[in-house]
UniProtKB/Swiss-Prot annotation:
Catalytic activity: tRNA(Phe) + L-phenylalanine + ATP = L-phenylalanyl-tRNA(Phe) + AMP + diphosphate + H(+)
Source organism of the structure: Prochlorococcus marinus (strain SARG / CCMP1375 / SS120)
Protein name from the UniProt record: Phenylalanine--tRNA ligase beta subunit
Lineage of producing organism: Bacteria, Bacillati, Cyanobacteriota, Cyanophyceae, Synechococcales
Name of encoding gene: pheT
UniProt keyword annotations, A-Z: Aminoacyl-tRNA synthetase, ATP-binding, Cytoplasm, Ligase, Magnesium, Metal-binding, Nucleotide-binding, Protein biosynthesis, RNA-binding, tRNA-binding
Gene3D superfamilies noted in UniProt: 3.30.56.10, Bira Bifunctional Protein, Domain 2, Ferrodoxin-fold anticodon-binding domain, Nucleic acid-binding proteins, Phenylalanyl-trna Synthetase, Chain B, domain 3
Biological processes annotated in GO: phenylalanyl-tRNA aminoacylation
């Protein structure tokens, strides 16, 4: 929102300088993003008077002008404008002036042999809207002509300071000059000088709705139309109106349109004018109030807007119709088929209150955002809608000798005044004490806070006075009634959208009194912050994976639609088709990352990600937290001895790397046979389990999918339920650090090799060995696995190393042998194993 200081001065008394005002607005929540001094654009520009002109002796299209710019002697300027003549006042850029809009610094130069000591400017060369095709002639601009040699900044409306404010979504009243004036009045406790609004033909008639328009009335939307005659679309606005519109970033069109835009800037209510005669031509009949309607557009319909753009409409877009012909997109832009023009003499003036959500949807659908849609999206109070119409009618009647023929509204406005209870106790409890600074002139040597004058500052704490509370709320326009507990507060129309609860009123009180005036209290006692157990485990997982060589990646959660997936979650308003749905897995993007890295001739790519996936199940959207990753190649730096060796990992190496990373969590993850999975290699994959629950999978990517990636080495991927890891790792018995004494006696190791069916897992065998050999067997683990030549089909050779140890005594051979024989026999029985050693 661009706020003009001179306009603001008309609406409220300002008793501080520009910088103080900017600071106070920023502290109150209206951040001043930029202070713009418009007069800076006219630095070096003066008013000149063309005394005489003569043709250029060496150029047919140039003239040599003698121009008085208020100096002792007139200067000579070579000019090529067709409308140059003697006896006119012009805008002269003197030597050294920099014209920003055309990136030109004026210097004394020779043009075709004639000296030129400046430049006679057009309005466009100064960054202003042009009024003709040539230079600016002040006599033709309907402004007071300044003295010769004086900068015409005041006459051009550029003697101005602009506050560029950032308006937050909860303060729609800040999108109007009146709203900002009220805020300045409340902050500085100064007098408001708002324009008086005369109610012209006060009563509105309620018109009949067609079927579709009734739906909009039921949404508490307001639609008002006023028929006004005896206007003139060929009239220009005053320079004051033009400059104020220009300073707000709005182009001047004609007096009718300009006054609707002027009202919008002043009051915050968008208005639109339809040419009544064009509507009659469009419909082929005399238009009455009952011809107007509001409905949803039909897919395939279109409207050429007043900006000349052809908008394709969908069934989500609300449109205004006349005899069912679309004449505007509700709350956004009017149609060219009914816009005000130079021939306009009669208009239908529209003032409406559209649903913020419907305007937002329509705006997104057509890809257009306007000053009107911005205001409707943030919300407008119904009282503002009607008062703004009256304000615009006042301006039109003052500018034209016009007649208000009809005034219509779609429903009776019933304004329910809601009183909010504001409790004194709640204010003091929420805001705390106010710090009162007092000066002690007779301070002794023992005073703790003594300034250079020898005076000391004494800080005292007190509750907020009732007077301060009442003054703050009254300055906002609230009406107060005393209550036993505090006050009953009636909120003004311009603040009804954001002051809805007691806490909202308390916030306003603290904002206006000043946040810095309240005592700040630290928590007592102070406790150091820290991580939750789950946060600690998550950090530990990251550290562990990084320590074994993984790199963390963060991939986009938005993906393209997968034609083979039926449980994807669609985004309601995607920006691109490539980001139209939420992801259902993490591994897909991980494979793409591996492919890109290997294409750049990296030795390997080990990555992981802790992220969320989304899917629809029985109509509900589920969110799952996963730990996923991929390994391809070998990340170790090759040496001269090993540089020529294959750097790919096998299944067991890759699984061991993941096992090493997760081993620090003190959780027992087991591998089991994985059912058929089209993503993974059928013989090199496993289902991972944690405490009997399915944790996820680990395995080599299926050869058919690997060939699509054009990578020479196998890729191993894993997907684990991260919530299950957190649940298991954060149990008290896992978090408590336990100490196991190092063994003080030697162990005895024996190897055992056996031939078993290839569907028997090594984990089952090692578990049986440990269980059978208790308490002497300390550990048993796989040291070799072979299937191929000299091994029967369907069989596999597995070799295990068994470690025996007693707690206190050294083991003897005669103690180990019976246990070892028992294990051998048990393996034969349980797995039909053929012992090889």
């Amino acid at each position: 929102m661009k706020v003009s200081l001179s306009w603001l001065n008309e609406l409220v008394d300002i008793h501080c300088d520009v910088e103080e005002l900017a600071d106070s607005l920023s502290m109150a929540g209206f951040e001043v993003e930029e202070l713009i001094d418009l007069s800076a654009s006219l630095e070096g520009i003066v008013t000149g008077y063309v005394i005489d002109i003569s043709p250029h002796p060496n150029a047919d299209k140039l003239s040599v002008c003698k121009v008085d710019i208020g100096k002792s002697e007139a200067i000579q300027i070579v000019c090529g404008a067709k409308n140059i003549r003697s006896g006119i006042h012009v805008l002269v850029a003197t030597e050294g002036t920099y014209l920003k809009d055309i990136d030109l610094t004026i210097k004394t130069s020779h043009l075709r042999g004639q000296i030129s000591q400046g430049m006679i400017c057009s309005l466009s060369e100064l960054g202003l809207p042009p009024n003709n095709d040539g230079i600016a002639i002040l006599e033709e601009m309907n402004i007071a002509i300044p003295k010769i040699g004086v900068c015409p900044k005041k006459q051009l409306g550029l003697d101005e300071i602009i506050f560029d404010l950032a308006i937050t979504a909860n303060r729609p009243d800040g999108l109007s000059m009146v709203g900002i004036a009220r805020e300045v009045s409340a902050i500085n406790n100064t007098k408001l000088k708002l324009p008086a609004i005369d109610l012209l033909h006060k009563d509105y008639k309620e018109f009949d709705h067609n079927v579709e328009s009734k739906k909009f009335a039921s949404r508490n939307e307001v639609y008002s139309l006023n028929l006004i005659d005896n206007l003139n679309g060929n009239n220009d606005s005053s320079e004051e109106v033009k400059s104020r519109l220009r300073n707000a970033g709005i182009n001047s069109i004609n007096a009718i349109v300009d006054l609707t835009n002027y009202t919008m800037l002043e009051q915050g209510q968008p208005l639109h004018a339809f040419d009544a005669d064009l509507l009659c031509e469009l419909t082929g009949k005399e238009v009455t109030i009952n011809d107007f309607g509001i409905r949803k557009a039909k897919t395939g319909e279109n409207l050429i807007g007043i900006d000349g753009i052809d908008y394709s409409l969908s069934s989500k877009v609300d449109v205004i119709t006349c005899s069912n012909i679309i004449i505007a997109i509700a709350g956004i832009i009017g149609g060219k088929n009914s816009c005000v023009n130079k021939e306009t003499r009669k208009i239908w003036l529209e003032a409406a209150l559209f649903s913020p959500s419907s305007v937002r949807i329509s705006s997104r659908e057509i890809g257009k955002r306007t000053e009107s849609s911005t205001r409707f999206e943030k919300g407008i109070s119904p009282e503002i809608t009607i008062s703004s119409v009256e304000r615009c009618l006042n301006l039109l009647t003052k500018t034209f000798d016009c007649q208000i023929l009809e005034k219509w509204i779609n429903r009776e406005l019933v304004i329910e005044e809601q009183l909010l209870l504001l409790r004194r106790e709640k204010i003091n409890k929420t805001l705390g004490k106010v710090v009162e600074h007092k000066t002690n002139i007779n301070a002794g040597d023992n005073s703790n806070n003594i300034d250079k004058s020898g005076e000391s500052q004494i800080n005292t704490l007190r509750n907020i006075d009732d007077h301060e509370i009442e003054q703050s709320l009254i300055s906002l326009g609230c009406k107060l009634q005393k209550d036993v507990k505090g006050w009953l507060v009636e909120v003004p129309a311009n603040r009804k959208l954001d002051l809805k609860r007691e806490i909202d009123l308390i916030e306003e009180i603290s904002r206006l009194i000043g946040y810095d005036r309240f005592d700040s209290n630290l928590p007592n006692p102070l406790r150091p912050g820290g991580l939750t157990p789950k946060q600690k485990i998550e950090r530990k997982v990251r550290e562990s994976l990084t320590s074994v060589g993984f790199q963390e990646v963060v991939t986009l959660s938005l993906v393209a639609k997968d034609q083979y997936s039926k449980n994807q979650v669609a985004i309601s308003n995607p920006l691109l088709s490539e980001t139209s749905h939420l992801r259902t897995n993490l591994w897909q993007e991980h494979l793409n990352i591996c492919q890109r890295n290997m294409a750049y001739e990296q030795k390997g790519c080990w990555i992981y990600e802790i992220g969320k996936i989304y899917n629809i199940d029985s109509g509900r959207i589920n969110e799952t937290s996963l730990l996923c990753g991929a390994l391809v190649g070998n990340k170790s730096i090759g040496q001269w001895q090993t540089e020529t060796k294959n750097s790919s990992l096998d299944y067991f190496q890759s699984r061991g790397i993941l096992h090493s990373a997760l081993n620090s969590l003190n959780i027992n993850i087991t591998d089991e046979k994985l059912d058929e999975n089209q993503l993974l290699h059928p013989g090199k994959s496993s289902m991972l389990k944690l405490e009997g629950k399915e944790l996820g999978f680990f395995g080599e990517l299926h050869p058919s999918k690997l060939s699509d990636l054009n990578i020479d080495y196998p890729i191993y991927i894993f997907e684990l339920n991260f919530n299950l890891i957190l649940q298991s790792s954060t149990r008290k018995n896992k978090l408590n650090i336990s100490f196991k004494q190092f063994p003080t006696v030697p162990s005895m190791e024996r190897d055992i090799a056996l031939l078993v069916d290839n569907n028997i897992q090594s984990l089952d065998i090692s578990n049986l060995i440990i269980k059978t050999g208790r308490p002497l067997v300390e550990d048993a683990y796989l040291i070799d696995r072979y299937e191929g030549d000299n091994i029967p089909k369907g069989k596999v050779s597995q070799a295990f190393r068994i470690r025996y140890r007693k707690n206190k005594d050294t083991l003897k051979e005669e103690e180990v042998s019976p246990i070892h024989d028992k294990i051998r026999e048990k393996l034969k029985v349980e797995f039909s194993a053929e012992l090889r050693s």
